[in-house]
Curated annotation (Swiss-Prot):
Pfam families: Glyco_hydro_1 (PF00232). Belongs to the glycosyl hydrolase 1 family. A beta-D-glucoside binds at residues 36, 140, 185-186, 347, 420, 469, 476-477, 485. Disulfide bonds join 221-230. The active site is at residues 186, 420. It catalyses: raucaffricine + H2O = vomilenine + D-glucose; vomilenine + UDP-alpha-D-glucose = raucaffricine + UDP + H(+). It comes from Rauvolfia serpentina. The record marks 390 as: Directs the conformation of W-392. GO terms for molecular function: raucaffricine beta-glucosidase activity; vomilenine glucosyltransferase activity. This is Raucaffricine-O-beta-D-glucosidase.
Amino acid sequence: MATQSSAVIDSNDATRISRSDFPADFIMGTGSSAYQIEGGARDGGRGPSIWDTFTHRRPDMIRGGTNGDVAVDSYHLYKEDVNILKNLGLDAYRFSISWSRVLPGGRLSGGVNKEGINYYNNLIDGLLANGIKPFVTLFHWDVPQALEDEYGGFLSPRIVDDFCEYAELCFWEFGDRVKHWMTLNEPWTFSVHGYATGLYAPGRGRTSPEHVNHPTVQHRCSTVAPQCICSTGNPGTEPYWVTHHLLLAHAAAVELYKNKFQRGQEGQIGISHATQWMEPWDENSASDVEAAARALDFMLGWFMEPITSGDYPKSMKKFVGSRLPKFSPEQSKMLKGSYDFVGLNYYTASYVTNASTNSSGSNNFSYNTDIHVTYETDRNGVPIGPQSGSDWLLIYPEGIRKILVYTKKTYNVPLIYVTENGVDDVKNTNLTLSEARKDSMRLKYLQDHIFNVRQAMNDGVNVKGYFAWSLLDNFEWGEGYGVRFGIIHIDYNDNFARYPKDSAVWLMNSFHKNISKLPAVKRSIREDDEEQVSSKRLRK
């Protein structure tokens, strides 16, 4: 088996990349998130989250006016999903827990939903029984609506204690079997698109002509999405306070896990960040080089610098000034080193050029304009990469290698997982089932990016695993069901029947591992097993 330092792969043929090119303990997996796949919005005692409220109150912000009420019904079809994962033969499955499914009121005093606990116990037990490691995210943007109504969710420091209470419940109920935890998924996306652009729940922010002229970097949102016309919120302050409280909640949960659970449960805990590679538009321009570095600071450094040094990046202090919150000495100490591993989610890259200073008055301050950069998709008419199904996602495989090396060198991170990486295509209802399963663009995307992950490892980055996004076609936030990210095709017209795409078959053939059943600790109320997976759903 190849070792991290010795593997040699054909630099001209990413199609031949396989498990043999990676260390024996390298983890290959795929992922999902609760709101995007579960459905069952009103089933089993689940309480509403801010995404339930947002999609119902502002259907104009979602393509087709759709929502995640049913999603792809994994709440009821999770056994099929486990069987699909078994057939794929990968090592791990990354999923998130719906905070309001286990705590409908957001905290213990509002009651623990035993049906929600049982659902996740059954999912975890099913994964382990088939040799699949669960990687669990605690927060994937779905704040319980009860806490949003009570004090504004992550706008308030009160969220820190409630998040810790929720995390402790999860550690206690599931930590005997879950050995890899992530506190937060893409807190950047939650802060910026929830509180600056207003495109995501809870839909706070403000759009002015200046913000339109200097848009934020596109990540998981279309440039042709509806402009947020709400008047609530302050995009020049709220994203920074929300991030401040996210970071404090993360650090407090990590401290709790390390002090009370890690020794007995022998697990690890980390955080997953949104990333893009920022390429200077003019590599010979000092201002563009500086702008690219600043763009990385405002996206990745905003979160990485506090958990490595205990403070925000210097560039953010300079350009945001007094609107950037400050950590107390105690908070800085708690933040510094608050991770066992770091997850990076990578999809695309941008060209970056320096932008002029905001001079239109304090009323127009926004995260978008604070960065003082302009994002470009092309250089002299040549795109940075081919277009995918979404206008924000241009394919640039070299970027994943560059961002991994950058993260290692800049923050000296000892252990990294690629926790999301994938590409979408447009949902085309005119395709036959056979045609819809031929996803050549995704297949090439995965091959090229996994190849570049291996190259980053050769560069000295300790990458311990890779998770393709996503297992299933699903509810893709502002895009609704208009695009497909899954390696498994969902037939929305046939009770969410699941069919493997070519990319899934390639992953199975290239990264299948001979797995043995691992004993699952069955602490849950088991469901009846009479419901069998239909052969139709699993035919290849």
